[in-house]
């Protein structure tokens, strides 16, 4: 169980590093955020079942719902930005002019 938790924490940290490194493209940032949410979902599910905290069983599902909403809003923004500006470079955007 410890090695699984350690692997999931490492996966979360790698996705966080990906967000920090690949923040110039919106698509790369969204993919790294999805990796972070997936590792958090699996880690929360494993911890809840390991410690028998079944009163918290809905928490990973709520996280998954928020993750799906975040992905939908992010993809909608990506489509809108790509249509108006021609690329997904975050540095070329000035949201005050839109």
Swiss-Prot record:
Reaction catalysed? Answer: a ubiquinone + NADH + 5 H(+)(in) = a ubiquinol + NAD(+) + 4 H(+)(out)
InterPro entries linked: NADH_UbQ_OxRdtase_chain4L/K, NUOK/Mnh_C1-like
Q: Give the enzyme's main class according to its UniProt record, as a single word.
A: translocase
Q: Where in the cell is it found?
A: Mitochondrion inner membrane
Mode of membrane association: Multi-pass membrane protein
Its EC number is: 7.1.1.2
Q: Where is the signal peptide?
A: none
**Molecular function (Gene Ontology), one example:** NADH dehydrogenase (ubiquinone) activity
Q: Name one GO cellular component term.
A: mitochondrial inner membrane
A Pfam family per the record: Oxidored_q2
Q: Which UniProt keywords apply?
A: Electron transport, Membrane, Mitochondrion, Mitochondrion inner membrane, NAD, Respiratory chain, Translocase, Transmembrane, Transmembrane helix, Transport, Ubiquinone
**Could you list the residue ranges forming a coiled coil in this record?**
none
Classify the source by domain of life: Eukaryota
| Listed transmembrane segments | 1-21, 29-49, 59-79
Biological process according to GO: ATP synthesis coupled electron transport
Q: How does it assemble?
A: Core subunit of respiratory chain NADH dehydrogenase (Complex I) which is composed of 45 different subunits.
Family membership: Belongs to the complex I subunit 4L family.
Biological role stated in the UniProt entry: Core subunit of the mitochondrial membrane respiratory chain NADH dehydrogenase (Complex I) which catalyzes electron transfer from NADH through the respiratory chain, using ubiquinone as an electron acceptor. Part of the enzyme membrane arm which is embedded in the lipid bilayer and involved in proton translocation.
What protein name applies here?
A: NADH-ubiquinone oxidoreductase chain 4L
**Biological source species:** Sminthopsis douglasi
Tell me the gene name.
Answer: MT-ND4L
